[in-house]
A protein has these predicted regions:
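Hard-cation-handling environments
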Residues: 289, 298-329
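N-terminal hydrophobic alpha-helix used for membrane targeting or insertion
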Residues: 6-7, 11, 32, 64, ...
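Generic cytosolic/nucleocytoplasmic N-terminal low-complexity/intrinsically disordered segments
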Residues: 1-3, 30
Length: 329
């Protein structure tokens, strides 16, 4: 009888142990930081090698942070023969492999004409945003003006803004009809109001933070209509928390600009051609930006590297094609 009781006790203890182990397995604690990290780039201009490092950095940070995103300030599909040969397709496929949360349009996204841009948009996993481009006579923008992305229980709105000088700097005939009359506009004279309306709309939709992906910059050709440069845009609007800028290839790690409402706005830009990768950390309403020298980051992503090898091989084969000959020595 005594042995039977001991056996029963042992069985009960073993059963309790199994339940305890199972419970431990089911309640694994995620000790990663709740801070939000946004990696950003601008004006890459087809320097495709940087995408592998960007993807690797995203994955590495995701080991420490629960919420890691990637965004672009535009001018990614133009800048080298890789872009020209594929009419931007190689670049879009690379960006899909990295996985972007939001992208805007630079002036050079229109270089292959609007019809081709529409084809590329259909290939994109993340559709571009641009609040200030529309057909004349239409109230709605041609592309979605902003996108809302959830990071845990925090909603961030990204608003896309493209330089109004695109109308004259990127295949200008595509923006006019056969009679030379304008049929599209980037709204140079009402830009501040358009941007402000979208800030207000995003906040009404529940955005806790609002970030601009602006392709404006400080370039000499940025003066068009009421706009002088990115700082005048910030000073004439109210509600941005962070502005990630592009177009002038400026290197700005962090600059504080006071907006129309008297609030500090963080301004940053990564230069061009993946010279830097930007890192924005959001922690309880605080915003910190830093620039990481891409050449000093050594990790790469295997999947992106594999595709880079593929497109380089295709590019090499295309370069061997005979397109003509000359009888002149």
């Amino acid at each position: 009888m005594k042995n039977k009781i001991i056996s029963i006790i042992i069985c009960i203890l073993m059963f309790i142990g199994v339940i305890s182990i199972s419970a431990c397995n089911l309640t694994t604690v995620d000790n990663r930081s709740d801070n939000i990290v946004i990696l950003y780039e601008n004006d890459v201009h087809c320097v495709v090698e940087g995408y592998s490092k960007l993807s690797a950095m995203k994955k590495e940070l995701n080991e420490t942070y629960k919420h890691v995103g990637v965004v672009s300030g535009g001018d990614y599909i133009q800048g080298s023969s890789l872009g020209v040969i594929s009419q931007g397709e190689y670049i879009i496929k690379l960006m899909n492999l990295v996985g972007y949360d939001a992208v805007t349009l630079g002036n050079h996204e229109f270089d292959y004409r609007l019809e081709r841009l529409e084809e590329l948009v259909n290939m994109m996993d993340t559709k571009p945003i641009c609040c200030n481009f529309n057909a004349i006579g239409e109230d709605e923008p041609y592309f979605e003006p902003y996108s809302m992305v959830s990071y845990g229980n925090v909603d961030i709105a990204y608003i896309g803004i493209t330089t109004p000088t695109t109308i004259s700097s990127s295949s200008p005939t595509q923006f006019r009809d056969e009679n030379g009359e304008p049929i599209y506009t980037f709204n140079p004279n009402t830009l501040y109001d358009i941007v402000q309306n979208n800030i207000d709309s995003a906040k009404s939709a529940g955005a806790e933070y609002v970030i601009a992906l602006s392709h404006i910059g400080y370039a000499d050709d940025a003066i068009y209509g009421e706009l002088e440069d990115i700082e005048t845009l910030i000073k004439n609007t109210d509600g941005f928390d962070v502005v990630l800028d592009a177009h002038s290839h400026s290197v700005i790690e962090e600059k504080l600009i006071i907006d129309e409402g008297g609030n500090e706005v963080v301004l940053s830009s990564t230069g061009t051609k993946f010279e830097y990768i930007g890192k924005l950390v959001i922690s309880d309403g605080e915003f910190d930006t830093q620039l990481i020298k891409t050449s000093e980051y050594q990790k790469t992503d295997t999947a992106v590297d594999t595709y880079l090898e593929q497109i380089n091989s295709e590019y090499s084969e295309l370069g061997k094609r005979k397109v003509g000959y000359s009888e002149v020595d």
